[in-house]
Amino acid sequence: MAAGELEGGKPLSGLLNALAQDTFHGYPGITEELLRSQLYPEVPPEEFRPFLAKMRGILKSIASADMDFNQLEAFLTAQTKKQGGITSDQAAVISKFWKSHKTKIRESLMNQSRWNSGLRGLSWRVDGKSQSRHSAQIHTPVAIIELELGKYGQESEFLCLEFDEVKVNQILKTLSEVEESISTLISQPN
């Protein structure tokens, strides 16, 4: 295979985007054959396979180390000097790709590494109670809190909580105690 066949910036940029979608964002259906036929149709499969593995390995190395731009430049320079490494044009495309996709890839990796549900959203409001078994409780303020919980790649679950004034005051007291404990721990000398 001629070196120029794997040099083009647009096909390499497309390949890196597809690898990121497959590896970090969980989009199925991105196959080696699809990538080769769409991006490098002139390259035989037996020559494309090692190139694909090399690019996937480089991308995984960069992402797993969460490289900043100085680390990235040093890493890519080392890759260009390595026997069977990458060309300086390929390094430039990889660098440009990482600069524009680092945040999304990092966020995706963080989401995938969480085992438990996380808080995706919170909304609250204060209403006046309009119905009650006891007429004295009608028109008293009620805090309604809605929590949106979920894991990466799954639909959210919603939890709706209702608190009267007494419960809100208890929660505020508990939060003040937690804040006090944290402040005490932080202000202690090592």
Swiss-Prot record:
Alphabetized Pfam families for the sequence: COMM_domain, COMMD1_N
Q: Could you describe the post-translational modifications of this protein?
A: Acetylated by EP300 ina stimuli-specific manner; protecting it from XIAP-mediated proteasomal degradation and required for interaction with RElA in response to stress. Ubiquitinated; undergoes both 'Lys-63'- and 'Lys-48'-linked polyubiquitination. Ubiquitinated by XIAP, leading to its proteasomal degradation.
Q: Where is this region: Required for binding to PtdIns(4,5)P2?
A: 125-190
The record's CDD domains line, in alphabetical order, gives: Commd1_MURR1
Record's keyword annotation contains Membrane: yes
**Segments for region (Sufficient for interaction with SLC12A2):** 2-123
- State its location(s): Nucleus; Cytoplasm; Endosome membrane; Cytoplasmic vesicle
Binding residue positions for Cu cation: H101, M110, H134
Q: Using the UniProt record, give the first listed, main subcellular location.
A: nucleus
List residues, modification N-acetylalanine.
Answer: A2
A Gene Ontology MF term for this entry? Answer: phosphatidic acid binding
Where do the COMM domain residues begin and end?
118-186
Can you name a GO cellular component term?
Cul2-RING ubiquitin ligase complex
- Role summary: Scaffold protein in the commander complex that is essential for endosomal recycling of transmembrane cargos; the commander complex is composed of the CCC subcomplex and the retriever subcomplex. Can modulate activity of cullin-RING E3 ubiquitin ligase (CRL) complexes by displacing CAND1; in vitro promotes CRL E3 activity and dissociates CAND1 from CUL1 and CUL2. Promotes ubiquitination of NF-kappa-B subunit RELA and its subsequent proteasomal degradation. Down-regulates NF-kappa-B activity. Involved in the regulation of membrane expression and ubiquitination of SLC12A2.
Q: Subunit structure, per the record?
A: Component of the commander complex consisting of the CCC subcomplex and the retriever subcomplex. Component of the CCC (COMMD/CCDC22/CCDC93) subcomplex consisting of COMMD1, COMMD2, COMMD3, COMMD4, COMMD5, COMMD6, COMMD7, COMMD8, COMMD9, COMMD10, CCDC22 and CCDC93; within the complex forms a heterodimer with COMMD6. Interacts with VPS35L; the interaction associates the CCC complex with the retriever complex. Identified in a complex with an E3 ubiquitin ligase complex composed of TCEB1/elongin C, CUL2, SOCS1 and RBX1; in the complex interacts directly with SOCS1 and CUL2.
Protein's name according to its UniProt entry: COMM domain-containing protein 1
| Organism encoding this protein | Homo sapiens (Human)
